[in-house]
Amino acid sequence: MNKLFFIGIAAGLLACASQPDQNENLMKQIQTNEYFEFVKEKALEVVKTGFNAGDGYGEVWIRDYNTFIELSAEVFENHVLKENLMVFFRMQGDDGNIIDGFIPAEKAGGGYDYIYSELEPRYAGHKNTVETDQESSLVQSVYKYVQATGDNSILNEKAGEKTVAERLEWSMDFLMNHRHNEQYGLLWGATTADWGDVQPEHDWGVYLTDDTHYAIDIYDNAMFLIALENLMELLPEQKEKWQPVHQQIFNNCRKHLWDETNQKFIPHIYLDGSPFPDDFNENEIYYHGGTAVAIEAGLLSKNEIKTSVEKMAENVKLSGAGSIGLTMYPPYPEGFFKNEGMYPYGYQNGGDWTWFGGRMIQQLIKNDFAVEAYEHMQPMVKRVKDNDGFFEWYTVNNEPKGSGTFRGSAGVLWKAIQLFEKFTKENNQQ
């Protein structure tokens, strides 16, 4: 017994002694990384050219802007960043909902059922109603704007008769009034592939339809948790109203969505049946993106985060993908989505997206897994240089697809590098 005790003490001391050496080695790697400077410069170059999601998109999307507004703050004046946010508030729905994106009205086309507002005649808006992240994305974007610029005057700006502060709360009220399921105490949306905005039942799949299968997933609810935290920091006088809501959503995510046995989030809770065959075991699928956002929302312990990144690394190995940006593993089988782009390992069904992989890197750094973060960052920054751009997604064979100037990818990698540099600075001061 005593021998085992002393062996345990010795092992603990050895681990403690090796940590400074490990950090020192990592700091050297960060400071001499052959890709980081290139990626930072390329990110600034790409973001200077505008605010649409990428060269394949005409619209400014709030879910994308949320991931590169801090990068944009490096090159644009505050009023330019603020104006983009104000467009979303001017186009807010009568029930408080927030659009996905906007485009100059004269360029509106391409099949969307466009939304117009008297408060903002210059633009046409659209909303992929299968998703439930637009409102949360706008709250997070305003928070990041205030953090990046120090300008909280936006909260008092008016769009019509309401201030931005009032409209932020209204958007959260929309989710509670129109997207909240009483039975589970969580937000719902359509069935999609993790964070995706394509449902299985339609050839395009971005709108709720009569044959939609309504479901609850971790991504929407984790985004809501982050938004509520941001809202309470922006508007501390409203904390009494929103703290109980945050606690309810947090507890119910753990209660209903976390699979303790398998140490993963279940893909969906179905409210009225699944769109998939009865003999399909959907819980075999591991959602990478939703897990990363859940970590950002504080839903997982250190041990659970460790298990999560280990599972992601194993999934990359099993799939042959290039990085932990892999949306999920295994993907949904052929034919499960009517949209032809959602084939196995295609687009949101198992494509490799730096846009979400980079968010996992950020959370690993913030949760003291900097070594693992650095390791998993390398394939993401390498392919930026190899392909001279920030591509939207990559195939399982690491081939670039989609927009080559995908600003969300640029934003998350740029921020991850900032966090690595902060890690180096803080450890140098110790």
Model-derived regions, located:
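Long, repeat-rich segments with strong aromatic
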Residues: 248-253, 298-306, 315, 319, ...
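Sec-dependent signal peptide recognition
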Residues: 2-7
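Solvent-exposed loop and edge beta-strand segments that line ligand/cofactor-binding
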Residues: 48-67, 73-75, 120-133, 206-223, ...
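C-terminal motif of bacterial Sec signal peptides marking the signal peptidase cleavage site
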Residues: 14-15
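Catalytic cores of carbohydrate-active enzymes
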Residues: 22-42, 60-61, 98-100, 173-176, ...
